[in-house]
């Protein structure tokens, strides 16, 4: 789970103000933070299949949001993937 301080930091960076939590870029950044944390968890706990299901759901949700952002605002999409370093 992401700490409140880290979550607020991400919201300010990608949402431009503290109340803008529904912004697609903010949602993608928060999901990316969760995904990175879960990757480390799976290195230690290879047989944790229950958490793997949630991990896959988060990856798919991020993928859908990235596709939405790419279609509706390509410039924001490019900025987001460069800032998060998730695609080449």
UniProtKB/Swiss-Prot annotation:
It comes from Mesomycoplasma hyopneumoniae (strain J / ATCC 25934 / NCTC 10110). GO terms for biological process: translation. SUPFAM superfamilies: S15/NS1 RNA-binding domain. Pfam families: Ribosomal_S15. This is Small ribosomal subunit protein uS15. HAMAP family: Ribosomal_uS15_B. InterPro entries: Ribosomal_uS15 (IPR000589), Ribosomal_uS15_bac-type (IPR005290), uS15_NS1_RNA-bd_sf (IPR009068). One of the primary rRNA binding proteins, it binds directly to 16S rRNA where it helps nucleate assembly of the platform of the 30S subunit by binding and bridging several RNA helices of the 16S rRNA. The gene is rpsO. Keywords: Ribonucleoprotein, Ribosomal protein, RNA-binding, rRNA-binding. Gene3D superfamilies: 6.10.250.3130, S15/NS1, RNA-binding (1.10.287.10). It comes from the Bacteria. Belongs to the universal ribosomal protein uS15 family. One of its GO terms (cellular component) is cytoplasm.
